[in-house]
């Protein structure tokens, strides 16, 4: 009796399996969509001010930029589910992203991307020779690659956050605006919101990273929980009352979690508007 039942099951399953294999071969990749079916796919490309390696080290469970952005978009209540991929790297600039092969490995083949945020310029200015000439060229090259690899995605160049002095930031951001204008792309200008938040407290959005050797020895036991390698890393202001007088204590301008939450909040507002406009056109 059992053997009689097995045979029909096998013969019935065989054509179903064959059909499934045929569909997998015939259907284009877009049918499988992205990493999570049914979700808007968002890619973040950038340097350390997007990656957030130190906050991730200090608070591994986060939530960090990409997760906060997902949560804020979900909190709107009327938007489709969103999945955010943070493919950023400390020290990176556009030329290195392309020449190192990291873009090919980590960005080119991501399926189903809908929105790509691009925020470079700080390291490009520091490391790229003839910055004012080569940075725009590199940016145009990256945009061409993104258009080729992700023709359905909306490309969103971003200005940099206040990191260098105001004059240097303007030089970078003016070039971003120039590139975007030639490419007929809208720029997401994050700079004004971040600058406005800094007026509430000039050091409230950056972590403290300081060489241990420059901290007086009588405080070494105090800072022991914050030691990482040869330095001290503090997420926010807890040691400021004791060590804030040290020269350069506030020198590292990388965002802490509060800084990344500013970026996430402003990005969520920008993206929510785009998603609603897209929905209204349907």
Q: Predicted segment positions?
A:
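N-terminal secretory signal peptides that target proteins for export/translocation
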Residues: 1-10
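Alpha-helical cap/lid subdomain in secreted, periplasmic
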Residues: 3, 35-37, 71, 75-80, ...
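Short, motif-level signal for alpha-helix interfacial/capping segments enriched in acidic residues
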Residues: 7, 25-27, 31, 234-235
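Residue-level detector of alpha-helical transmembrane segments in integral membrane proteins
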Residues: 8, 21-22, 144
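Bacterial N-terminal signal peptides
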Residues: 13-28
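Serine-esterase "nucleophile elbow" of acetyl-processing enzymes
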Residues: 24-25, 31-88, 103-111
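Acidic/histidine-rich helix-loop elements
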Residues: 51-63, 86-98, 126-133, 208
């Amino acid at each position: 009796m059992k053997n009689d039942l097995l045979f029909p099951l096998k013969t019935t399953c065989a054509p179903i399996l064959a059909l499934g294999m045929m569909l997998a071969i015939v259907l284009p990749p877009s049918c499988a969509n992205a990493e999570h079916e049914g979700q808007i796919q968002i890619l973040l490309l950038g340097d350390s001010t997007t990656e957030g390696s130190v906050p991730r080290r200090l608070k591994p469970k986060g939530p960090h930029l990409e997760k906060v952005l997902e949560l804020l978009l979900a909190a709107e209540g009327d938007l489709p589910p969103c999945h955010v991929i943070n493919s950023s790297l400390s020290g990176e600039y556009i030329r290195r992203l392309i020449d190192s092969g990291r873009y090919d490995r980590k960005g080119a083949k991501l399926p189903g991307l809908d929105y790509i945020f691009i925020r470079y310029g700080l390291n490009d200015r520091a490391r790229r020779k003839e910055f004012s000439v080569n940075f725009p060229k590199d940016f145009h090259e990256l945009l061409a690659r993104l258009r080729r690899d992700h023709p359905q995605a909306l490309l969103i160049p971003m200005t940099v956050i206040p990191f260098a002095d105001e004059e240097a930031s303007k030089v970078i951001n003016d070039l971003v605006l120039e590139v975007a204008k030639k490419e007929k792309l809208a720029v997401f200008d994050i700079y004004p919101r971040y600058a406005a938040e800094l007026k509430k407290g000039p050091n409230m959005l950056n972590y403290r990273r300081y060489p241990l050797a420059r901290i007086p020895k009588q405080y070494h036991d105090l800072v022991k929980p914050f030691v990482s390698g040869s330095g001290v890393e503090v997420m926010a202001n807890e040691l400021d009352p004791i060590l804030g007088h040290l020269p350069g204590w506030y020198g590292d301008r990388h965002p802490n979690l509060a800084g990344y939450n500013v970026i996430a909040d402003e990005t969520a507002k920008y993206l929510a508007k785009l998603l609603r406009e897209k929905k209204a056109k349907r």
